[in-house]
Amino acid sequence: MNALPLGTVPPQKSLIAIPAWNEAGSIASVVASVQEHRPDADILVVNDGSTDLTAQEAQKAGARVVSLPFNVGVGGAMRTAFLYAQREGYQALVQVDADGQHDPADLDRLLEGLADSDIVVGTRFHPESMYFVGGPRRWAMVLLSKALSWMNKGTISDPTSGFRSAGPKAIELFAIEYPADYLGDTVGSLSIAIRQGLVIHEAPVTMYFRQVGRPSKNALWSALYLGRATLAILATGLKANRTPREDAS
């Protein structure tokens, strides 16, 4: 792993973290759009073992780049970003996808939400949204949303959203404990945060379909994984909510 660049970060300084794997075709435009909407923020691209020119394109666009020696997945890349944020003293971190799905115009909303939250999840499912997910994946997402919302005692309508912000408590937690498996950066991290008592809210955001490339998993595989994740979360939630009498029986 490359050495992480060091520097002095003023209090409340925000870090925009962009995990990227073979996103040379879109990373420069994503970095430029983030710079346009949040010129005060630092941008860190975690180059996740790319075999194309992702790192070079990100550097030319003005981002700081940390290159991992091989592909570890979004969870591993974001763990690196949280470690960087913790070490450099950032008070806020926003995860943005490298494929152009997330609209940097919503960065302000996600950062402002940290005033009364530890994590703010950007949801694409709101009345003004034109984003559509159908079929088995949508059914699995609905079930997962209900399970996480029950555990959270507050609505999480878009649990697989990777467009989210994290405050100081979440940065400290995720620098130590962050799942690296598929969707660990979304579903798994929320489950961990809920169990640790972090305050999670959501905010409406705009999301688009990928600019270039294709998803790493197909819709059916994702639906099956989400269904399994829902069962695991429900089992964890039921265990955590047992009374001492029930545990003794």
Residue positions per predicted region:
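Terminal low-complexity segments of carbohydrate-biosynthetic enzymes
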Residues: 2-6, 12-13, 169, 228-249
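Donor nucleotide-sugar binding loop of glycosyltransferases
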Residues: 23-26, 50, 103
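A conserved acidic beta->alpha catalytic loop
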Residues: 47-55, 100
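Acceptor/aglycone-binding surface of glycosyltransferases and processive sugar-polymer synthases
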Residues: 68-87, 104-183, 209-227, 242-249
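Short beta-strand-to-loop acidic/aromatic patch adjacent to the donor-nucleotide binding site
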Residues: 90-101
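Catalytic donor-sugar/metal-binding loop of nucleotide-sugar-dependent glycosyltransferases
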Residues: 155, 178-181, 190-208
